[in-house]
Amino acid sequence: MEKLKILVVDDESRMRKLVKDFLEREGHTIIEAVDGMEAMDIFYENKDISLIILDVMMPRMDGWQVCREVRALSQVPIIMLTARGEE
């Protein structure tokens, strides 16, 4: 399996850790961001990101905004996540 540089974006530290631990065990390099604004800063600085795993609901800049901004610049694959369930 190809080793990837993956940006994991989630305001919940437990979710970031869960995703990071799993992917690092597979040999991937993980970069973490706590919100959309930090994710965009990291994305601009790292042109070799292979995948973005992105929470939908975050403060400052949500996942949809990040997705639109990234899509305007790149075709990097994006996986959108949410922990929100039906009540």
Per-region residue spans from a language model:
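Receiver (REC) domain active-site loop signature in two-component systems and cognate sites
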Residues: M58
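Charged docking surfaces used in two-component/phosphorelay signaling
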Residues: K17-R25
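Conserved sequence signature across two-component system core domains
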Residues: V9-D10, A33, I52
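Active-site residues of response regulator receiver
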Residues: D55, T82
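Acidic catalytic/metal-coordinating carboxylates
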Residues: D35-E38, D62-Q65
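Conserved phosphotransfer cores of two-component systems
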Residues: Y44-K47, E69-V76
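Short hydrophobic/Thr-rich beta-strand motif most characteristic of the beta2 strand and flanking loop
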Residues: G27-V34, I42
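Active-site beta3 strand of CheY-like receiver
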Residues: K47-I53
